[in-house]
Amino acid sequence: MVPPTINTGKNITTERAVLTLNGLQIKLHKVVGESRDDIVAKMKDLAMDDHKFPRLPGPNPVSIERKDFEKLKQNKYVVSEKTDGIRFMMFFTRVFGFKVCTIIDRAMTVYLLPFKNIPRVLFQGSIFDGELCVDIVEKKFAFVLFDAVVVSGVTVSQMDLASRFFAMKRSLKEFKNVPEDPAILRYKEWIPLEHPTIIKDHLKKANAIYHTDGLIIMSVDEPVIYGRNFNLFKLKPGTHHTIDFIIMSEDGTIGIFDPNLRKNVPVGKLDGYYNKGSIVECGFADGTWKYIQGRSDKNQANDRLTYEKTLLNIEENITIDELLDLFKWE
């Protein structure tokens, strides 16, 4: 059944949409047609991203390897929990004269997120990096902000992390959640890597609030980098390593993107039948890849480098305790 089309204003066209995460559903309006194209183009322009195709103006982490340990010791890094949610850019802008708060996923799908008390200054153009996740205690959606690209029309992406975070929080100083809001707005807490005991205590608290699947380790001094960032790391427990494959045929053949060949190439097969062209997240168990969930928020498979690095991560099996114990002497 085709969702009904709703006209929310002069020219902004949306469709009703439902996102399901960790068993909880959130009803949103998905922006479609020219309205969607306009918002994506505005974000690309505001972020000053000269990439050929639209993409999220933020970094993609790489899985950490033992060879990266020395880099962590020689540079300043902060750590936080890796929430198991959906990555979005939160984009405040004006469309056809209307002030809108939108969230945009990796597939360039745009949703309206209608908070009630957004400070007007943000609509000069603001791009915040964050994740939609579920507060398992309150059984509500939370949008966790962890970085900023543009704040109230001012580009902050070249600043260090502390300055970007300060600018973002200051711009939201007057914001207050109300019961009608679709999600709770929160900030990610970054902790210096040289404080392993504090990090472990924080992770215990975070695990009691959110579904988490490891760590994010971010450079303090580095600016925002669009695309893959080899100085931004993620660490997942051995049982949580996953790859996003593309279904290459309905019999379950799965593939990755090979940049040298500029096409998807098969690397295995799943049991069962699937929709050709869809993206599926799979975990590795008992020597084979197993289906976990569909990824409608993505429109392309992981590339060969990600695939090969994930296989190395599975082999190295680095644990969170092993990583944090490197800094015990501190």
UniProtKB/Swiss-Prot annotation:
InterPro entries assigned: mRNA_cap_enzyme_adenylation (IPR001339), mRNA_cap_enzyme_C (IPR013846), mRNA_Capping_Enz/RNA_Phosphat (IPR051029), NA-bd_OB-fold (IPR012340)
Active-site feature positions: K82 (n6-gmp-lysine intermediate)
Co-factor requirement: Mg(2+); Mn(2+)
Major enzyme class: transferase
GO molecular function: ATP binding; GTP binding; mRNA guanylyltransferase activity
GO biological process: 7-methylguanosine mRNA capping
Subunit-level organization: Monomer.
Reactions catalysed according to its record: a 5'-end diphospho-ribonucleoside in mRNA + GTP + H(+) = a 5'-end (5'-triphosphoguanosine)-ribonucleoside in mRNA + diphosphate
Function recorded in the entry: mRNA capping. Transfers a GMP cap onto the end of mRNA that terminates with a 5'-diphosphate tail.
Annotated organism of origin: Paramecium bursaria Chlorella virus 1
Keyword 4Fe-4S: no
Tree of life domain: Viruses
Designated name of the protein: mRNA-capping enzyme
Its EC number(s): 2.7.7.50
Ligase keyword on record: no
Keywords: GTP-binding, mRNA capping, mRNA processing, Nucleotide-binding, Nucleotidyltransferase, Transferase
Entry similarity comment: Belongs to the eukaryotic GTase family.
